[in-house]
Amino acid sequence: MLGIEEIAYYVPERRVSNYNRKEKFNITDEFIKEKIGVEQIAVKADNENTTDLCLRAYDKLKEKIQISSDEIDLLVVVTQNPDYSLPQTSAIFQGKMGLKTSCASFDISLGCSGFVYGLSIVQSFMAANKMKKGLLFTADPYSKIIDTDDKNTSLIFGDGSAVTLISENPIFVTEDISYGTSGVDYKDLICENGVLYMNGRGIANFAIKEVPPDILNLLSRNNLTIRDIDKYLIHQGSRFIVSSIAKKLDVEEEKVPYDIYDYGNTVSSSIPILLEKILKDKSVKRVIASGFGVGLSWANAILTRVR
């Protein structure tokens, strides 16, 4: 049985305060705290690239669990901001870390739904190829493509990375996953000519419309109710989006963690960062992991504790 054994993450030390940009964007303290829910964003160093963020997360993982580079059978990186257009970021990482040459590697081009998709892909690939240990990285440094004069993006997105160890000794396993795509709205979150554009209102409306019913359908087909879930790990798009989804689901606030005031929306890393913080909390038996955004795309997973 394959599943999540351990998670580690890295958030750069450098911060840019949103309070220092109130006058520039004509915003208030209340807007910062309650609407976007990001007081400062994390920004990578100028000499850090996507692979470097992955390496930092991997170093954190090795501090938590004994793992040999020879044990890694699969290396997958979820990113849409790679080091280069080609080769794949995972290959660069394999070379930098000196992992065995029999280690399979590939990238997944997905944004905020990427962690949930990645879990399914990695676990299925490993099972099909009789692999024992795999690493799922999420790293999407949006500071590479953000216009610092754009209110809709520069106040929200922060840099960060996470690595999830998938093995035959899991803490959480995937019970079921649902997926969705709304490609007709792709221009609501798009990078053109190297600059990110986001229709903030459009993305919020999309998430609030599509995510809650999809979660309810997922629960229903597994004979579960809202009350059977201990934590709802909702992609940390903004305070407004997370709160709105929780209200639509009629879930009490303590079941829906929100934790990006200090570093911002880390795209595909936001869910594993949340999950890492409850991984060893045995009172949490079953969680929903919900990712949504670029595509437009969404994916919801039921994760169940097995130890």
Language model: regions and residue ranges:
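Short acidic, glycine/serine/threonine-rich loops at helix termini
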Residues: R15-V16, P87-Q88, I146-D149, W298-I302
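Short beta-strand segments
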Residues: V78, S109, G134-D140, I166, ...
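Flexible, glycine-rich active-site loops centered on histidine and acidic residues
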Residues: A127-G158
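Condensing-enzyme catalytic core mediating Claisen C-C bond formation in acyl metabolism
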Residues: M1-D46, T148-N205, K209, P213, ...
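Claisen-condensing/thiolase-fold acyl-transfer catalytic domains that form or cleave C-C bonds
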Residues: T51, L55, N81-P82, K100-S102, ...
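Buried hydrophobic positions in well-ordered alpha/beta secondary-structure cores of metabolic enzymes
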Residues: I4-E6, I32, L61, L75, ...
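Acidic-glycine-rich active-site phosphate/pyrophosphate-binding loop
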Residues: F25-I32, S85-G98, L135-Y142, K187, ...
